[in-house]
């Protein structure tokens, strides 16, 4: 006779589920208890370091450390609190009374705080409603401070208040020295150190000092080699997000900084600022052989090699030499076949960003550079300059071997190779 297996009843399913859930919880607690100690997650400050923190940073520290205490206590760990925690608990109580937040022991969860020094007062349910923000604390003590415009969540109410000024544009804290304004008092305090020269944050490795903790954090990556910001196109990494942003423009071809006088475009503001000196005459570096002026000393040094014939950068594959290291880097790609710059329109790839920028003008029909003599237009500044020499007869590039002159450097380079083959 075949055996008949009866399905479990709903009651037995609930009972089994409850017993199984309790067993899993106990196993997890036992496992986590052996892996995590409070020392693993605790952060200690000296009195001097504590004095440097602003109220928002102290609030964040208090919330994080108290939450760590709660979570570890719920696992049954014996927690030895840092010396600041008792002070923070007292501050938490005072802040609760001052803000008028309704507090009470949570009725839904049994008190898990049996560890040394922890009391049921820490496990509370708080709720505060206002016109622009909402704050709730759940059973684990996690804080929800959500911006009602972008829905970004912050760990403290003060952080949310400071964040909302991004949307409103409010900058109530002005510098009395230069008039620059900021959205928070702490940002203004950091800015004022520019005027008074105060640099309280010192690197333990090299002794260099900084006006803000964030600058020190970025600087330390020089010593430890940390580069957390990675380019998704080529994999190159950077120690600072501000370095990654202009690098990404190499791949996209974006050049947001445009000169109003010569219409040249630039990827970064620093290069654009140096370029403007060419027009204003500020900080000019003038070649004493041809009188040509440059915005930086390095550009002038590179230019001198035209007159001296010096090509210090040599390709190990073919022996070809170059005046600039960047030119050698681009040339090496002709051997490796690497073309990291791709056109989004047609998929064509190029060895350098400049070629990609010029190529894109084929798609949009842009020819920004016009000859003032004949009206012919070009999509590259160097092309219109070269073309205008057909009208002026100017030939600024002279061969050091035979004295012959040329309208462009590329023509001179081709001509120079003829002498090199004869030697």
Curated annotation (Swiss-Prot):
Keywords: DNA-binding, Metal-binding, Nucleus, Repeat, Transcription, Transcription regulation, Zinc, Zinc-finger. One of its GO terms (biological process) is regulation of transcription by RNA polymerase II. One of its GO terms (cellular component) is nucleus. It is found in: Nucleus. The keyword Transmembrane helix does not apply. May be involved in transcriptional regulation. This is Zinc finger protein 557. It comes from Homo sapiens (Human). The lineage of its organism: Eukaryota, Metazoa, Chordata, Craniata, Vertebrata. The gene is ZNF557.
